[in-house]
Amino acid sequence: MNSDGRHHQSSSGAPRGPANPGQRGQVPPDDRLTAILPPVTDDRSAPHADSIEAVKAALDGAPPMPPPRDPLEEVTAALAAPPGKPPRGDQLGGRRRPPGPPGPPGSSGQPAGRLPQPRVDLPRVGQINWKWIRRSLYLTAAVVILLPMVTFTMAYLIVDVPKPGDIRTNQVSTILASDGSEIAKIVPPEGNRVDVNLSQVPMHVRQAVIAAEDRNFYSNPGFSFTGFARAVKNNLFGGDLQGGSTITQQYVKNALVGSAQHGWSGLMRKAKELVIATKMSGEWSKDDVLQAYLNIIYFGRGAYGISAASKAYFDKPVEQLTVAEGALLAALIRRPSTLDPAVDPEGAHARWNWVLDGMVETKALSPNDRAAQVFPETVPPDLARAENQTKGPNGLIERQVTRELLELFNIDEQTLNTQGLVVTTTIDPQAQRAAEKAVAKYLDGQDPDMRAAVVSIDPHNGAVRAYYGGDNANGFDFAQAGLQTGSSFKVFALVAALEQGIGLGYQVDSSPLTVDGIKITNVEGEGCGTCNIAEALKMSLNTSYYRLMLKLNGGPQAVADAAHQAGIASSFPGVAHTLSEDGKGGPPNNGIVLGQYQTRVIDMASAYATLAASGIYHPPHFVQKVVSANGQVLFDASTADNTGDQRIPKAVADNVTAAMEPIAGYSRGHNLAGGRDSAAKTGTTQFGDTTANKDAWMVGYTPSLSTAVWVGTVKGDEPLVTASGAAIYGSGLPSDIWKATMDGALKGTSNETFPKPTEVGGYAGVPPPPPPPEVPPSETVIQPTVEIAPGITIPIGPPTTITLAPPPPAPPAATPTPPP
């Protein structure tokens, strides 16, 4: 204890005295991190006015206070201070010095002899620091006023506003047939959109949108200050986030910023929207903004942009919209789904009237014209939605076109969904209709599980002219399925034989044979004895072609190689290696000649097209031309090199064609109409170990069209029979569909002939049948006789010998059963 009777802290030596009532005590140092405790004394006075102040001081960790002054000095300083101002001695950096211990009665500065008066705590009043209050107010004003201005200016200078046309919205790509008719639309996930130029939008439609959304559009700076302030309030305290945005702000929100949200993130989005809209107004013309806005805004029914909305609500081009129709579309922008006339006719009518009144207010419509307007009729929503959905076989064409664009033409999905592509395909509407009608006709009344696939390809360039994989736009595509081909694969054994110098006149036995314990027979015991390989192909003799395959160098692998050369894919989805016994690229087994391995319908059409083109292979393709929304040609097949690849020697291909020419007529009279030349081959596969069938084929071509037809069942797990229960062979329903498709597709075109084959293996084409054996003339001896009694004759005179002409040829034998 010192001379003044005050204790000192042992750890710091800072003075510590009793608390003066009404005064804030000295803040002790923060000793929470030390184990040294101050000494305990009898002095119970606290250094702070109350326990709360003590805790706050301890947490603040304030430095120790300097020693207090003498009480006499305190009084003297208080008396000398100006009125209303605390003595300077009580101000240390904005803090009062701590008072000393209370003095004796009368030592507080009161005149002697007076009774003690209630003490006024002048030092506490002196704690209010007006200088710091003023500084705080200035800082607050700077934050509230100057900071947003500086931030806005910096953001304005930094933000980069794209040029008109740089912002690519997701647009609908259109798929067209070769004649320009529409096949399908590739609709982006968020809906239907087709961009148009502002010049295509009638003036009254533009004025209706302005009247509905931003009546000062052409005069405002791109933003509404009152609307922005209202949006800020609603972001912070809840409420409608629309905020009375201008057309420019709405466009920025939809194209660049995104939809607003409540809270701080929503406020930041709104601020960004304001900056970009302001700068855009200085760099874009108002017409550019309006055009971009009309192409991006949502109108309901899955329609984005004024062009798609015109189709969705009125089924007409935007150029044909009337004043009343344009006003209704403008009325929908605020609440497109709920204001649809099909949902809320009264609300739609009220908003429509409001838009028309706005057009009068903005001088876009005269009062008389306004009075003449009638609320327009709209198409049903279901019809509008159906317009955006591809139906029937076209959906499978769309699928193939999309795949081809993505895989083959370096047109990625983003480009496909944003550039509003116009894709012209190779599909010939006449051929497509013929294929669809043929399938519908011949499958009508059959088993509901029966399915068919048809693909027609132009041999000159590989263009797919008709494509039918099923009638469900979103269903399974049987034209892309792996299916067993049966005897239609024998053609590739013939290709391999001719490539090895075995001509069409080569004779082969047709009797049954057994190889490795497997007995090979012909359907219904057919045979030709021994005949040439062209005749064996016409009759589809399994035994003859099995023997031919065994004779080939390479055997079954030679058949596989010939098939791949012609155009049979080496792999496709679901089959990593085609024509391979182990499925890993290993060699095939002998059953390849009978069509045991899986092949797609489109590949059979393509491979036969190679034969039709005298051995020149053209990859099958759907895409003829691709043009972007702004008219840029991205791809044009007519300018590409399409000379093809001579995969098979011309002489070989032409001899194969010659061997196949009689088959269509031989297969139950399926010659093409008008005597048109064709080359074809049927095929049938067996259903397991039964005598029933599972798949049936007819594949054939003319010089200008190759068509493959498959008929089977959904899962291939049941016998393929007609409605009457009869087994279906390739010469039956598939040949019917093939003939109808070819006749319909080629109707109106000139008949063509195949090239005359040159010699291969000593034969140029199919050798003529051997002449019948010569029959020597017969002689007849006539002996004159005379009857001498009833029933009794005797010769008279010498006999006479007469030479007779050869007998006339025997009538033709019965026609053999056509090949399956």
Swiss-Prot record:
Q: Which GO terms are recorded in the biological process aspect for this UniProt protein?
A: cell wall organization; cellular response to hypoxia; peptidoglycan biosynthetic process; proteolysis; regulation of cell shape
**E.C. code:** 2.4.99.28, 3.4.16.4
SUPFAM superfamilies reported for this sequence = beta-lactamase/transpeptidase-like (SSF56601), Lysozyme-like (SSF53955)
Q: Which controlled-vocabulary keywords does the entry list?
A: Carboxypeptidase, Cell membrane, Cell shape, Cell wall biogenesis/degradation, Glycosyltransferase, Hydrolase, Membrane, Multifunctional enzyme, Peptidoglycan synthesis, Protease, Transferase, Transmembrane, Transmembrane helix
Residue ranges of region Transglycosylase? Answer: 180-360
A Pfam family the protein falls into: Transgly
Q: What is this protein called?
A: Penicillin-binding protein 1A
Gene from which this protein is expressed: ponA1
